[in-house]
Amino acid sequence: MIYLRPYKDSEFESSVEIREIKGEEARERWRGRMSRSGAWDDHYFHLAITDDDALVGDLQVRHCGQAMPDGALELGLELSPECRGKGIGTQVLKLATERFFADGAHRICGSTEIENVAMIRAFEKAGWVKEGILRGLFNDNGKLIDYVSYSIINNNS
């Protein structure tokens, strides 16, 4: 069963691997954020994604008040490689949507690399709507990477 919950201290090394964190400064910044998971930390909110209490991923929710209106959130998730393509992403999107809509959000958006077919399927199976292509969003050593953007709206807010 898939759950979203605050991190346990003992999950630090596993979470570093899942999030592919490199460098001591980044590790320490993550250690601080992880210790405050389950609560807003500046404009970030992190939760552990677990399958029967085993850590399988990380959920990040962001709200930047200067760039987004109240009630609009951006969601990201990372799953360990062995857990991808098994429907976990779809379950996480549904759980997160339910939780953050209940907390008052009216809109949640997310994006993924245009070639990440598994995540695109997860967005669509979870009822999210494709908004468009974010052309050249990231520059990976001179190669521009396109992303596809999805969102879901709380029509009951």
Predicted regions and their residues:
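Conserved GNAT acetyl-CoA-binding A-motif
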Residues: A102-T112
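Amphipathic alpha-helical recognition patches that constitute DNA-binding helices
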Residues: Y3, S14, E74, E78, ...
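Conserved acetyl-CoA-binding loop-helix of GNAT-fold acetyltransferases
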Residues: G85-R99, V117-K125
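Alpha-helical hinge/cap motifs
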Residues: G76, C83-G87, G132
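Conserved catalytic-core motifs of GNAT/GCN5-like acyltransferases
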Residues: Q66, S111, V129-D146
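GNAT-family acyltransferases
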Residues: M1-E82, R99, K143-N155
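Short amphipathic helical patch at the helix-1/turn junction of helix-turn-helix
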Residues: L79, E113-I114
